[in-house]
Amino acid sequence: MTLNEKIREKLEEVDPLVFYGQAEKLDETVLWNYIVFFREKRSGSENRTSHTVTFHVAVVRENEIPEGLEETVIEKMLELPGMKLGSESTYAYTIKPGTGAAVEVLDIPFTKARKGR
């Protein structure tokens, strides 16, 4: 099983609607309550024998993200061997097109060291 498959499996324990990269076309009538994860960058070590991959998990909720959901997502991701929490989570806000509904997005970074170039 690939790392992306393992991440998806863990996140689906929190929310059944999980996307990789970006959310696919969602109908305006569907609640925007889902999770998206993606890779941001790959950084090599100084000795070039390993590298670190930075992942982001974006929790998207109409209106607001319930208290405790951030901690649940973090706990699930940290169950993956070698996964570490990044330094700073950020919140962003937007309006769902055609509805006027507020949408809150929480971006949580994680890193995973891997052997090899």
Provide a role label for each language-model segment:
Residues 1-9, 26, 40-52, 89-117:
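Short, charged interaction patches at domain edges and termini
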Residues 1-45, 62-65, 69-72, 98:
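Small/polar-rich, solvent-exposed N-terminal microdomains that initiate assembly or binding
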Residues 16-22, 79-90:
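Short secondary-structure junctions
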Residues 35-37, 51-54, 74-76, 102:
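General N-terminal targeting signals
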Residues 37-39, 81-83, 110:
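Aromatic-residue hotspot detector
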Residues 54, 63, 85-86, 104:
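Short, charged/polar low-complexity linear motifs in solvent-exposed/disordered segments
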Residues 57-83:
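Mid-chain, well-packed structural core segment of small domains
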